[in-house]
Curated annotation (Swiss-Prot):
Enzyme Commission (EC) number: 2.4.2.59
NCBIfam families: sulfide-dependent adenosine diphosphate thiazole synthase
Alphabetical UniProt keywords: Iron, Metal-binding, NAD, Thiamine biosynthesis, Transferase
Protein name in the entry: Thiamine thiazole synthase
Pfam families membership: Thi4
Similarity annotation: Belongs to the THI4 family.
Length: 260
């Protein structure tokens, strides 16, 4: 067969355009492609939810790729190994209760698990703003191309309608910060301000799950964004809390969708 470059171009443009249009009205928008949102994406998609994940960078995985200080290994607690099992991620016990996995394999299989389950990924697409309706409830997200955002180009965005948003943007908690900045008298969490505390792995891991919640009408926080939204400590390259937070975020979203 002789390849035709124009057909290649048309195939890519046509198929992506159809997908993009189909996902302008969805059930759940996951902002940020880190481990918590990848876990949530898999479980939501498996439940039949129309879910899309938006990541500003080219690659997904957040800070998991590099493990700890570029040593490509991560630690996971025993209670989260069942999620590793769900994704087919290999691990071994280092000491009692401490399990070690290859960070590159972990990210690859998290991505494969989410996409194989049916979650649609839009990488190189950045979150710019939220959409609101009555009582300032979150009803969608405003997006642009990632390079437009990073290069600070003056290009108007496009909009996605969604029933729920999950902020999985890590330390920056970008969606939460947008709400605080743009909605008068909006309150995120009990303290109404953002930013995680310094390192305390034990407390940070525990609170990552506890802090995963619908923190504002239409907005669920997950992963490190949940810690940032509730002033909980950071935890470093131990990822059990991130995985369990993603699982909890999916469960919360499924329950909430029944009421919308």
């Amino acid at each position: 067969m002789e390849l035709d470059e124009v057909i290649i171009t048309r195939a890519i443009f046509d198929e992506y355009s159809k997908t993009f249009l189909d996902y302008t009205d969805i059930d759940v928008a996951l902002v940020g492609g880190g481990p918590a949102n990848l876990v949530a994406a898999k479980y939501l998609a498996e439940a039949g939810v129309k879910v899309a994940l938006y990541e500003q960078k080219l690659s997904l995985g957040g800070g998991m790729w590099a493990g700890g200080m570029m040593f490509p290994r991560i630690v996971v607690q025993e209670e989260a190994t069942r999620i590793l099992d769900d994704f087919g991620i290999r691990y071994k016990e280092y000491e009692s209760g401490y399990y070690v996995a290859n960070s590159v394999e972990s990210v690859g299989k998290l991505i494969a698990g989410a996409t194989s389950a049916g979650a649609e990924v839009f990488n190189l697409v950045s979150f710019e703003d939220i959409m609101i309706r009555e009582n300032d409830r979150v009803t969608g997200i405003v997006i642009n191309w990632g390079p437009v955002t990073t290069q600070r180009l003056h290009v108007d965005p496009l909009m996605i309608r969604t029933k729920l948003v999950i902020d999985g943007t890590g330390h920056e908690a970008v969606v939460c910060n947008t709400i605080l900045r743009k909605i008068p008298n909006a309150k995120i969490g009990e303290l109404g301000l953002l930013g995680e505390k310094p390192m305390w792995s034990e407390v940070g891991e525990r609170l990552a799950v506890n802090a995963t919640q619908e923190i504002y009408p239409g907005l669920i926080v997950a992963g490190m964004a949940a810690n940032a939204a509730t002033r909980a400590p950071r935890m470093g390259p131990v990822f059990g809390g991130m995985l369990l937070s993603g699982e909890k975020a999916a469960k919360l979203a499924l329950d909430r969708l029944k009421t919308i």
